[in-house]
Amino acid sequence: MYAREYRSTRPHKAIFFHLSCLTLICSAQVYAKPDMRPLGPNIADKGSVFYHFSATSFDSVDGTRHYRVWTAVPNTTAPASGYPILYMLDGNAVMDRLDDELLKQLSEKTPPVIVAVGYQTNLPFDLNSRAYDYTPAAESRKTDLHSGRFSRKSGGSNNFRQLLETRIAPKVEQGLNIDRQRRGLWGHSYGGLFVLDSWLSSSYFRSYYSASPSLGRGYDALLSRVTAVEPLQFCTKHLAIMEGSATQGDNRETHAVGVLSKIHTTLTILKDKGVNAVFWDFPNLGHGPMFNASFRQALLDISGENANYTAGCHELSH
């Protein structure tokens, strides 16, 4: 499954979007629960013809969350500029779904180092930890008034980002020839929310891949921050928002009307500012299937020649 891009008629100031297919906003009851069956051996355990793997453990500063980080390094020599590198959230599920067929495709381009940031569990997702790590504090809701998945503690994205950028990344990149101009971050759902928040808050990465970000779960205020960006501060960064078109019978769009208007305004403002951003539509894919499709697309994108994006905002200096 490949993404379909939507282009503006204005060159170098493009932001790709298709609001009729945009289904970022969903209510709690219309999301299918993730498959939480224990995982078996992954590609690191089985071995690959194209990559070799290592795993490292980390703990949060407060000692309450425990991480397992897999690093996959191509078996080919790094180019003179260094390997591209993609950090991927929900690393347990990523590693479970990564296969040698995809790694072969990557090896035919400029294969990236893959860093799958997961948790010390045999489950595909640590639901409590990711709910805290991937959500921004400013938009956190009063979860004690909610039940189910929304009763989980949230608002720890700043702490997790500091861990990722100051401890995890330096450790996994140690001894590797990395192209810092092709360093990317991918996340889905709450992970997509974290990527969008990181695009606003950090310049550590160059490419930000936000897949099906959970903006409709009380975090749509993040769009106000997006609208307020100063374009010159984002000239070195590239944002890709990835979303699946609603499938037949999917009623998520009925919950999106109010926020879709905000998204339309946000995208228009970004477009006018020349911010380097794209929207990739995945036809006929729902929220869950977007996990696989989006992480594969992000890997293929960062391994391609087009990964060295030029900033659209340079036009504003004329």
UniProtKB/Swiss-Prot annotation:
Changing D90 to A/N: Loss of activity. Its EC number is 3.1.1.107. The active site is at S189, H287. Changing E253A: Retains 78% of activity. One of its GO terms (cellular component) is plasma membrane. Monomer. This is Apo-salmochelin esterase. It comes from Escherichia coli O6:H1 (strain CFT073 / ATCC 700928 / UPEC). The gene is iroE.
